[in-house]
C-alpha cells in the first residue's frame, strides 16, 4: 500500500516509494 498517498501522486509511488506533499519520496529517507 501507499503510505501518505494523495491524488497528486502517481501510482508508481506505491512501488517502494511513498507520497509526501504531492511528491514521491523514498521510504528509506533518501
UniProtKB/Swiss-Prot annotation:
Tissues in which the protein is found: Expressed by the venom duct.
Single GO MF descriptor: sodium channel inhibitor activity
Subcellular location: Secreted
Disulfide bond entries: 2-14, 9-19, 13-24
Domain notes: The presence of a 'disulfide through disulfide knot' structurally defines this protein as a knottin. The cysteine framework is VI/VII (C-C-CC-C-C).
Function, as annotated: By structural similarity with conotoxin GS, may inhibit the sodium channel (Nav). No effect was observed upon intracranial injections into mice and intraperitoneal injections into goldfish (25 ug).
Name of the molecule in the record: Conotoxin TVIIA
Organism the protein comes from: Conus tulipa (Fish-hunting cone snail)
Amino acid at each position: 500500500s501507499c503510505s501518505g498517498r494523495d491524488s497528486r501522486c502517481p501510482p508508481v509511488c506505491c512501488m517502494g516509494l511513498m507520497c509526501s506533499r504531492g511528491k514521491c519520496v523514498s521510504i528509506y529517507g533518501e
